[in-house]
Structures are given as structure tokens and as C-alpha cells.
Regions:
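Bacterial Sec-dependent N-terminal signal peptides
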Residues: 1-11
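C-terminal motif of bacterial Sec signal peptides marking the signal peptidase cleavage site
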Residues: 18-22
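A residue-level marker of the well-folded mature domains of exported/periplasmic proteins
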Residues: 25-29, 33-345
Length: 345
């Protein structure tokens, strides 16, 4: 019966997402190295690169997950990081997207990823000019027979962490901090709100957007206002901006270790970001995380390209059933009762 409710709730989520409407941190524009090769060859000849959005590969979120997937693929297939294997190009601002993608093409990479919906136009532009190169865009849909579009069912995982938040909250006030307001981030918000309301219709969900994926100070300011208004849980889908939410939660926990205050992480298991020590005792403000397996998707599509099965012109969507969306394995702050209820959905 619960699974039926989940299906109905998700239908409402998609509708809500339409009505309502990953994620990075700032670093210098650079690359790990540059490489080359011919398209669709064996592991020894195959090369692959990715272009980040304005976040770095150490953003503890979306871009980092993609890079970890590329690293895992390279190591699994005996590729070297550098001129003959796998590589990343880091973007410092929007103007770097086309430049970095073109640089990857000039270095003859067989497959070039654009990490994040902000790179959609740049990928389409360069892909149209280079029909013999394979491209993939993450979190968006781009046109072109040589472009694979990788998307996720973010509303599914957001619904589950919403259930957890709705059952965990003591104040019935919950916050959501999004990065740039868009159809994509609205999927997170709508799914989360639906999950909360499914188990706790009395809870209020305050949905706000920072307008930036790369502004930790803005995230901290927003979190301070939400926690100050009585929220005890905030879910962020804001990339590097979300790091500020963790900072504020940890500061408040440092001031009052007995206060129940939590953050729900995104994209990766962000338990490590919530860890702190007060008076020699260890605490963690991460309630759970909505894990979006960008790393898995990058590995999958890279392998298909290497095996001459590149899904150009296709939309590949990852959800719970495809093992592309899940709730984090680190669940120390959730009771077994709450975990059982989440599992029912």
C-alpha cells in the first residue's frame, strides 16, 4: 500500500515541480592534464574528459562525484590521468565552458562530458561543430546525434529524505536551500516537500533559492535565518553554497551541543561534512543525504562509449530502480523506526 502511495505522491511531485519552476564551488580555471586518441577504441586507446561547471572537482558534491566516477573508470580500465587517459577541465566562470570544451576537442578526447545543466548550450554548440566527437551532458537534455543526455529522478530521492525529515522534526519547521532556481532544482524541492507532507502534513517547508551554486557565505546566511526562525532541519540542493548550510549548523551545534539541528546533504553521502567535536565528544549534524550517483552514470556512459555502444541522441535517466538515486548509507542520526518507514516507500 505504501508503494502505491509513493507512486501517487511522485505524480504530484512532477506536477508540483512544473508549478514551482548541480551543483559547484569556485576555483581557478585549470585542467588535470590533457589527452588524445581516436573515437570508439579499446581501453588502451580510449580517452575521456569532463568540463566542470563553476565548481571544482573538490566541491564535496556534484562535480566531485563526477570526477570520482571518471577516476574509477580510468583506474578500472588501466587508463592514466593525463595525456593518454582521463582528465578534467575546471571552469572558473560561464565564459570558460565553450573554451574548455573546445580545448578538450582539440586534444582529441573520444568523449567529453559537460557536468551540469549550465553547460547545455556550450555542449550543443561545440557538438554541432564536431560531429565525430562524442559528448555527454549531465542533468540536462541537449540535441545532437553525438550527444548523450544523462538525467536523474531527483524527486524520488528527495521524496525519501523528505519522509525522514517529516518524521524527525521536532519543531515542524523545515527548510530547503536551492542553488539557482530552475526546473532541475525545483524537482528536488517538490519531491522533498511531498515527502514531508506524506508523513507530517502539519510541518511547514520553507523553500528558498540562493541564486548561486558557489556562494557558501550566502548559504550560511540563509541557514542562519531558517534556523533562527525555528527550523531544525534544512535540505540543501545548492552545491558549494550548501557548504555554508553545514557551517552554520555546526556553529550552532558548537554553541549548544544539546540542540537538535540537522542538515540533509545532496549528491554524495555528506556525513563527513557534518562532523564536529565539542568538549571532546563527537557529533554530526548530517541527518542523511540524497545520493545522486553521478559517478555511476559517468562510469556507465564511458564504458558504453569505449565498447562502441555510445548512446548518442538518447536520454538516459537514472532513478531508484536504476540504482542511480538512493538515501545515504550513513544513517546514524535516524532511528530504526524512521528508517523502516522510509523503506516502506
Amino acid at each position: 500500500m505504501k508503494k502505491r502511495k509513493f507512486g501517487l505522491a511522485l505524480s504530484m511531485v512532477l506536477a508540483a515541480g512544473t508549478i514551482l519552476g548541480a551543483c559547484g564551488s569556485d576555483d581557478d580555471n585549470n585542467t588535470s592534464n590533457e589527452g588524445g586518441g581516436d573515437a570508439e577504441e579499446t581501453a588502451g586507446d580510449f580517452t575521456v574528459s569532463m568540463v566542470t561547471d563553476t565548481g571544482g572537482v573538490d566541491d564535496k558534491s556534484f562535480n566531485q562525484s563526477a570526477w570520482e566516477g571518471l577516476q574509477a573508470f580510468g583506474e578500472e580500465n588501466g587508463l592514466e590521468e593525463g595525456t593518454s587517459g582521463y582528465n578534467y577541465f575546471q571552469s572558473n566562470n560561464d565564459a570558460d565552458y565553450v573554451t574548455n570544451i573546445n580545448t578538450a576537442v582539440r586534444n582529441d578526447f573520444n568523449l567529453v562530458y559537460g557536468i551540469g545543466f549550465l553547460l547545455t548550450e556550450a555542449i550543443q554548440q561545440v557538438a554541432a561543430q564536431n560531429p565525430d566527437t562524442h559528448f555527454a551532458i549531465v542533468d540536462s537534455v541537449a540535441e545532437g546525434d553525438n550527444v548523450a543526455s544523462i538525467t536523474f529522478k531527483e524527486h524520488e530521492g528527495s521524496f525519501l529524505v523528505g519522509v525522514a525529515a517529516g518524521l524527525q522534526t521536532k519543531t515542524n519547521k523545515i527548510g530547503f536551500v536551492g542553488g539557482v532556481e530552475s526546473d532541475l532544482i525545483n524537482k528536488f524541492a517538490a519531491g522533498f516537500k511531498a515527502g514531508v507532507e506524506a508523513v507530517n502534513p502539519d510541518a511547514e517547508v520553507d523553500i528558498q533559492f540562493a541564486g548561486d551554486f558557489n556562494n557558501a557565505s550566502r548559504g550560511q546566511q540563509m541557514a542562519a535565518a531558517m534556523y533562527g526562525s525555528g527550523a531544525d532541519i534544512i535540505y540543501h540542493a545548492a552545491g558549494g553554497t550548501g557548504n555554508g548550510v553545514f557551517t552554520e549548523a555546526k556553529n550552532l551545534k558548537q554553541q549548544d551541543p544539546d540542540r537538535e539541528i540537522f542538515v540533509i546533504g545532496v549528491d554524495r553521502d555528506q556525513a563527513e561534512e557534518g562532523a564536529l567535536s565539542v568538549g571532546g565528544e563527537d557529533y554530526n549534524v548530517t541527518l542523511t543525504s540524497m545520493v545522486k550517483r553521478v559517478d555511476t552514470a559517468v562510469q556507465d556512459i564511458s564504458k558504453r562509449a569505449m565498447d562502441e555502444d555510445f548512446p548518442g541522441g538518447e536520454i538516459i535517466e537514472y532513478g531508484i530502480q536504476e540504482e542511480g538515486i538512493s538515501i545515504a548509507e550513513t544513517q546514524d542520526n535516524l532511528s530504526q523506526e524512521i528508517l523502516d518507514e522510509v523503506a516502506n516507500y
